[in-house]
Structures are given as C-alpha cells and as structure tokens.
Amino acid sequence: DIVLTQSPASLAVSLGQRATISCKASQSVDYDGDSYMNWYQQKPGQPPKLLIYAASNLESGIPARFSGSGSGTDFTLNIHPVEEEDAATYYCQQSNEDPLTFGAGTKLELK
C-alpha cells in the first residue's frame, strides 16, 4: 500500500496568513502525466469535503484561496488567506493505486 505522511500534524495560523500542509507518498502517485493526489477538508460531525483533485485542480465551489501543487511523491496544500471557516482537519489521499489511502491528517487552528 502507498503510505502518505502528512506534516505538520497540527498548525495554528493567524487570520489572513498562509497555511501550508505537506504530504509525502512512499512511492510515486503519477500516471500518464497526471498526479493522483487529492486533498480533503473535514469538520467535526461532517463528511470529508473534496477541495483539490489531481494535485492542483480546484473542485467546483471551493474558494480560490485553496491551492495544491506537487508531483511524484511530494505535494503541498496552501490556504491563503486563511479565514475563520478554514479551521478543520485536512487530509491528503492518493487515488493512483488500490487500496486508496489517506494521510493521518493535519489539524488547522486559528490563533
């Protein structure tokens, strides 16, 4: 299975600042020119919400302050500027290979 290692496990960011979350895969999640890495946001009591798919594509309805980058084994989610509603746990997920796997999550809090 592909192991996804997220960092940091938690971070506290001031309103309007940038939050950066990293995800490293144990092997490449690229195939045929695409990177099969996705990012989700989850708030307590709610299902995960897809933010970014294929490393850098913004899901419909998601604000442009969310952006994703990376390829191969190294990926990043950026949130800028951070807003109050962004306090949540964020997960990376690879969809290149079964079984689909998730990172352990990064909890974003506001200072």
Curated annotation (Swiss-Prot):
Q: A single Pfam family, by name? A: V-set
Has UniProt tagged this entry with the keyword Disulfide bond? yes
For the region Framework-4, give the residue spans: 102-111
| Keywords associated with the record | Adaptive immunity, Disulfide bond, Immunity, Immunoglobulin
Q: Where is this region: Framework-3?
A: 61-92
This protein's source sits in the domain of life called: Eukaryota
Where are the stretches annotated Framework-2? Answer: 39-53
Instruction: Write out the ranges of the annotated region (Framework-1).
Output: 1-23
User: Which residue stretches, if any, does this entry annotate as coiled coil?
Assistant: none
Record-linked PROSITE patterns: IG_LIKE
The record ties this protein, via CDD domains, to:
IgV_L_kappa
**What GO CC terms are in its UniProt record?**
immunoglobulin complex
Q: Which residue ranges are recorded for the region named Complementarity-determining-3?
A: 93-101
What S-S linkages are listed for this chain? C23-C92
Give me the ranges of the annotated region Complementarity-determining-2: 54-60
Region annotation Complementarity-determining-1: residue ranges? 24-38
| Any one GO BP annotation for this protein | immune response
Regions crossing the membrane:
none
- What protein is this chain from? Ig kappa chain V-III region PC 7183
Which species? Mus musculus
